[in-house]
Amino acid sequence: MLIEKIMGNIAHEEEHHEKKTEWIELEWEELSKRILRTETDQGTDIALRLEGDEPLKYGDLLWEDEHRRIAIRTKLEPVIVITPNDMHEMGKSAFELGNRHTPCLIENNEIIVRADHTINPLLDEIGVHYETTERRFKQPFKYRGHSH
């Protein structure tokens, strides 16, 4: 199936009571690809050829008929979710992650970083609560380069 345009976004209504949703699962880095050959989680062959330079987003609806729809979501990835108890722990966590140039997302009261075995001892040392789990990223990390 050739797909050349995005029809909408279903990020806020992932499940539909009348239509089956097939997912194209991508690494979040792949969201910027405009040409891609892949398949859905149900095995439907997909050729993606999009115009423009707007990146794909979690929930982008690529195809739909009366029985099913095909949309984008990111793959589950191993992450470390840090849950500081107060501003002191938040500050220590942010300082240490920033000092290492570790990209992070802040959602609700959590700091989320990609799993990295070198971060766990650091978090243990500063005494902040964290857990290693899996999540789907709904937005990309923002890398900010600089030089010393």
UniProtKB/Swiss-Prot annotation:
GO CC field: cytoplasm
UniProt KW Chaperone keyword: yes
Function recorded in the entry: Involved in urease metallocenter assembly. Binds nickel. Probably functions as a nickel donor during metallocenter assembly.
Domain of life: Bacteria
The keyword Cytoplasm is assigned to this record: yes
HAMAP family linked: UreE (MF_00822)
CDD domains recorded: UreE
Annotated protein name in UniProt: Urease accessory protein UreE
Family: Belongs to the UreE family.
Pfam families in alphabetical order: UreE_C (PF05194), UreE_N (PF02814)
GO function term, MF aspect, one: nickel cation binding
Location of this chain's protein in the cell: Cytoplasm
Keyword annotations: Chaperone, Cytoplasm, Nickel
Gene Ontology BP terms: protein folding; protein-containing complex assembly; urea metabolic process
